[in-house]
Amino acid sequence: MKNNKKVIAIVLVVSVVGGFLFKTFAPYFKSSKGVENNTTENGAILEPADFMTDSCYAFIQKQVAFGPRIPGNTNHAECGNWLIAKFKSYNCTVKEQVGSMPNWEGGNTSVRNIIASVHAGATKRIVLAAHWDSRPYGDKDPDPSKHKQPIDGANDGASGVGVLLELARISKDLPEDIGVDFILFDSEDGGKPEWAPDGENDAYSWCLGSQFWAKQKPQRTMRYAVLLDMVGAEGARFHKEGYSMQSAGTAVNRIWGNAAKLGYGEYFQNEETAGIVDDHLFMIQANVPSLDIVDMRPNFMGTQFEFGGSHHTHSDNMSIISKPTLKAVGHTLAYTVWNLK
């Protein structure tokens, strides 16, 4: 997840001109888009297969056990191979996007996006995405001696992937007319560290995998895309992020409404926040309506939202992962997918 220095009190309005993102400041707004009716065409509400938190937790633990998943290292390669094998074991059609993108240091970072599809022939589709790399630096750790050491990324990285793997596992019971494309974006979290001087293109040092994906001009076959980022910590709070409301406000309201209906309103807060730079922003650039389910909490003064105390520190490990949080996210998404409009 992108550094929260870029989480600001007003929304950065995105214009897509000639394939580039131009950011301008504008007052924050409230979306007027309504909540969709959550029924199938014949009026029935479908109950999804059970989302099992034990297996979801185990998927997160397995990723962390590989060690830091830094693009180009052995841990990263082995974890990627394991992820592909798991999706294939759930009868997903899997393909990879491999390439490289410029990084903040002036060089290039490798990209290995993983795309796993369920019911590839279905025309009613949704994208569920997360990033699978982990941060090369613990640059916000309270111990300065650890700032240049890679972190586990249990929450920031592995948690979203764990939820997607569990959804893939239970997808054998998904109605055949509904298709899901699981996208694991690579090289999301290698952006400019805290100690490096600021530059005018810092925002582009993050989310390299989704930038690479957008450059491939993906065909628009999905209703919308849902990004999961930092969805496993105890006490997580998911607010209606600004770019998400601009791009896919109806879908945001529907998912948050589903969460409230299922008893997870404590996690899915009915409050809007400023926009942040995350993988969904580059999906939006590719003309895909997209939203971000991301843990952001008010700071101690209540003046702005932040990513929490473990963000980009060495405390982002398995000790902060909460099964009730995983259940809230996974059950809500399963219910939404099974009743996709």
Question: What positions do the PLM features span?
Answer:
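A non-catalytic alpha/beta surface segment that caps or lines the substrate-entry region
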Residues: 58-121
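Active-site-adjacent substrate-binding region
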Residues: 38, 231-341
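N-terminal capping segment at the start of a domain
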Residues: 31-80, 90, 302-320
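Acidic/histidine-rich catalytic neighborhood of metal-dependent amide-processing enzymes
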Residues: 148-250, 275
